[in-house]
C-alpha cells in the first residue's frame, strides 16, 4: 500500500470513518441498486488514482482492483503469472526477460503491450514526475540518470528497459535483485495506456486499467465506484458485480453501518468494539495473525534526535524502552495486536524474535531513564522541548497514542511527550510528505509483496528518502543499504534472510522508526455477505465476496 502508509491503525481502530455512513454516489445502470455490489469502507485517497503515485491504502485498495500487473498474489501471498507469460532471470539476477500473454486489453479497448510496461515504469522512476513509487525502480539500470530534475523533461526512459516486440521486453539491473520477479506484483509496476500521457491529471480522476474491475465514478470524500470488468482474463475473476468504496471519517459509524447492513465490509473495528466484535451476532467477525506493522517515525533531522549522533541514538532508544507495548496491546488494543520485536511481521519470510538489539523494543523503565540522562549530559532537554506524536484523528489512533505518550511521560518522570493530532488522513499525510511535521509521526506498513525486502528497503533505504519513496523520516545509513544490496544478490532465500536480519539489527540500534505492534488481520462483514476472508495484506478479498440472494 499499500500501501503501504496505512490510512488507519491496523489494530485498535484500524481505519477511520465518518460520523454517519457516507452517502452513495450517483448511481448508474452498471452499478445499480439491487446488483451484487459490495460496499467497502475506505479513506479519501491522498493522491489521484495513479498506481505509481499511490502508497497509502485509501488509494491503494481501488488501484489494486483496477490494474493487473505481471504477477498476482492469492489470499496467502502465493504468486502466479498474471499478464506475464514468463519472467526469466539470468544466473546472477541482473537481467530479466519478460514475455507477456496475448490478448490483454485496457478498459478503453487498447492493447496491453511491452511498451505499456516500459513507458509506465520509466515515467514513475523519472524524478521530474514526482511519483512516490519512484524508488521501487532504483535497481533498474539508468535510474540514477533520471533523478536530476534540473535536466529532465519527464519523458526520458530507463536505460535498462529494452523492448523486443509487443509481447516481450528485457530488464537490465544495476545490481543483482533476486526479489525483482516478486516485486513486479506491486501496483507501482502496473502498465499504463497511452491515454495516461495525454492528460495525467484527468487520468488520475478517472483511471483506465486492465484489472478485474473498471472505474465508474469518484465522488470525492464520499465514494469510489468500481464495476466488474467483463473483459478481464486474469487470476482474480470477480464473483460480484462491483465494489463501491465508501469514505468514512469515524470508524464507529462504519461499524454501525455493518451492523445494519448499510455497509458490507471493513478491515478493522473501532476501539469501542474490540472486546465485543467476535461475539457480536449482528456481524461476521475475522481475527487472525496479520502482516501489518504499526510504528512511529522520528525524522532524522529532528532536534535532540538527529540520526547518527550519540544524543539522537540515546534518546531514540530511551523513548522506545519507555513504552509498555504489552500493556497497550492488552489494555488498549484488547488483544488485536502483538508487541513488535522487529521491523517486519511474524508472517514475513525470515522473521526472527531474537535479533541483536531487540531489547531496545522491550519496556525497561530503569534503562530508559539511564539513557535519557546520558543524552541530557550531551544536550539538556529543557522545559521548552517536547516530543510530539502526530497522527490522523479520523483513524481511531487517539487511544493508542495517548497510551504511548502517557507511558513515556510516566517512565521518564516528566512531560516529555504530547500528542499532535491532524484532523484527517489527508491533512496528516500531506504534512508528512511535505516534511512539515516537527516531531514523531505515526507510520505503518502493509506489505506490497511478501518479502522482508519490501518492509526494509521501501521504508529505510537511502534511495527511498527525500520524497522518492516511503522513507518519510529521510533515514540514510550506508551499512544498512549495503546489507540490503547483498541480500538482494544472495543465491538462496536463507542467505538473503540472514542478511536482511543483519540489516534489521542496524535499524534496531538506530531506530529511524520505533516499532510498536503487529496488527492482527481483523475486521467485520455484514451477515448477508458470503466469501468474507482477509488476505496476506490484512485486507478483504473483495473479488470473492457476494451478497445473499444476489
Residue ranges and their predicted role:
Residues 116, 123, 129-193:
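Surface-exposed binding/hinge segments that line
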Residues 41-91, 208:
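N-terminal lobe/hinge region of extracytoplasmic solute-binding protein
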Residues 113-120, 166-172, 211-212, 240-242, ...:
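Alpha-helical secondary-structure segments
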Amino acid at each position: 500500500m499499500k500501501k503501504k502508509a496505512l490510512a488507519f491503525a491496523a489494530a485498535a481502530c484500524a481505519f477511520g470513518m465518518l460520523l454517519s455512513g457516507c452517502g452513495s454516489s450517483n448511481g448508474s445502470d452498471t452499478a445499480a441498486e439491487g446488483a451484487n455490489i459490495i460496499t467497502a469502507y475506505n479513506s479519501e485517497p491522498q493522491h489521484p488514482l495513479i498506481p505509481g503515485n499511490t502508497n497509502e491504502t485509501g488509494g491503494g485498495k481501488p488501484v489494486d482492483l483496477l490494474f493487473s500487473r505481471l504477477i498476482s498474489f492469492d489470499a496467502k501471498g502465493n504468486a502466479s503469472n498474471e499478464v506475464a507469460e514468463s519472467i526469466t532471470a539470468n544466473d546472477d539476477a541482473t537481467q530479466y526477460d519478460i514475455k507477456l500473454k496475448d490478448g490483454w486489453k485496457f478498459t478503453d479497448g487498447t492493447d496491453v503491450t511491452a511498451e505499456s510496461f516500459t513507458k509506465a515504469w520509466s515515467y514513475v522512476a523519472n524524478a521530474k514526475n514526482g511519483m512516490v513509487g519512484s524508488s521501487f525502480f532504483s535497481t533498474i539500470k539508468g535510474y540514477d540518470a533520471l533523478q536530476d530534475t534540473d535536466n529532465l523533461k519527464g519523458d526520458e526512459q530507463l536505460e535498462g528497459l529494452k523492448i523486443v516486440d509487443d509481447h516481450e521486453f528485457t530488464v537490465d539491473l544495476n545490481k543483482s535483485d533476486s526479489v525483482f520477479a516478486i516485486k513486479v506484483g506491486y501496483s507501482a509496476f502496473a502498465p499504463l495506456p497511452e491515454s495516461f500521457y495525454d492528460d495525467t491529471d484527468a487520468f488520475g480522476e478517472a483511471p483506465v486499467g486492465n484489472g478485474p474491475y473498471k472505474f465508474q465514478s469518484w465522488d470525492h470524500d464520499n465514494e469510489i465506484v468500481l464495476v466488474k470488468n467483463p473483459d478481464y482474463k486474469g487470476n482474480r475473476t470477480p464473483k460480484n458485480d462491483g465494489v463501491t468504496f465508501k469514505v468514512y471519517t469515524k470508524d464507529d459509524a462504519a461499524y454501525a453501518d455493518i451492523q445494519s447492513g448499510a455497509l458490507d465490509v471493513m478491515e478493522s473495528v473501532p476501539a469501542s468494539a474490540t472486546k465485543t466484535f467476535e461475539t457480536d451476532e449482528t456481524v461476521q467477525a475475522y481475527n487472525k495473525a496479520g502482516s501489518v506493522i504499526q510504528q512511529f517515525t522520528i525524522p532524522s533531522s529532528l532536534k535532540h534526535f538527529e540520526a547518527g549522533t550519540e544524543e539522537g541514538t540515546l534518546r531514540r532508544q530511551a523513548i522506545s524502552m519507555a513504552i509498555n507495548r504489552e500493556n497497550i496491546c492488552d489494555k488498549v488494543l484488547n488483544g488485536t495486536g502483538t508487541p513488535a520485536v522487529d521491523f517486519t511481521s511474524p508472517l514475513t519470510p525470515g522473521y526472527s524474535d531474537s535479533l541483536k538489539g531487540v531489547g531496545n523494543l522491550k519496556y525497561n523503565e530503569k534503562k530508559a531513564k539511564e539513557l535519557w540522562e546520558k543524552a541530557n549530559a550531551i544536550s539538556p532537554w529543557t522545559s521548552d522541548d517536547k516530543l510530539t506524536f502526530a497522527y490522523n484523528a479520523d483513524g481511531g489512533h487517539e487511544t493508542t497514542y495517548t497510551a504511548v505518550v502517557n507511558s513515556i511521560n510516566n517512565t521518564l518522570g516528566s512531560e516529555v511527550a504530547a500528542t499532535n493530532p491532524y484532523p484527517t488522513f489527508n491533512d496528516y499525510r500531506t504534512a508528512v510528505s511535505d516534511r512539515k511535521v516537527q516531531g514523531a509521526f505515526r507510520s505503518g506498513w502493509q506489505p506490497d509483496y511478501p518479502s522482508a525486502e519490501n518492509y526494509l528497503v521501501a521504508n529505510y533505504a537511502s534511495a527511498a528518502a527525500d520524497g522518492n519513496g516511503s522513507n518519510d523520516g529521510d533515514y540514510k545509513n550506508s551499512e544498512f543499504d549495503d546489507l540490503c544490496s547483498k541480500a538482494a544478490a544472495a543465491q538462496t532465500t536463507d542467505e538473503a534472510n540472514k542478511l536482511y536480519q543483519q540489516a534489521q539489527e542496524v535499524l534496531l540500534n538506530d531506530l529511524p522508526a520505533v516499532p510498536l505492534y503487529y496488527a492482527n488481520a481483523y475486521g467485520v462483514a455484514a451477515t448477508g455477505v458470503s466469501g468474507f476472508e482477509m488476505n496476506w495484506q490484512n485486507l478483504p478479498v473483495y473479488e470473492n465476496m457476494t451478497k445473499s440472494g444476489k
